[in-house]
Amino acid sequence: DFADAGGGQWTHLLTSTASSSSSIAFSSTYITTTYLDYMIVVSGIKTSDNGATAAIHMSTDNGSSYLSAYRETRMGYKSSDATANAGNQSASAIYIQGGAATGNSAGQGFDSVITIFDPLKQSGTTDKRTVLNAFSVHHDTSANLTTTNVAGATKVNTAVNNIKFSFDTGTFTGKVSLYGRKIS
């Protein structure tokens, strides 16, 4: 029985249901030293605004303020056989989809799995920035199916204890779940 091995599995911590929400944040109530890594699963998201872009913001003071500078690199492809966006940039958020924004017509939406590695600096690497990897799928405003792989990082070495999912405009509905991974 692999359950006896312990460690390494993801534990469901919370699912929030967004209903015309501007953001969903996971605070230090859930981002604790009990878990090393965290995963956010964004499911069945529908945006109020056509052309919204999904983003992650991180806080070092439990959401009193959010960091305003990040680095990211991404590669995305559309079902129209075109590159959605490739490149890297400094940004005010970690945008977790390619340059093609999310459509909100019938049948269109956004889904993503975001893994955040050791945000509380428990690995003995206190001078390391918090990094994430996001794999996102959405329909753009032209109804192209788009897939994007994004790597993002803070520009500070401080522990992150609050992580927020949002769009750059409008509100959204859907499910946003948080999971934690223990190492033992």
What are these model-predicted stretches?
Residues 1-184:
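Surface-exposed molecular-recognition determinants
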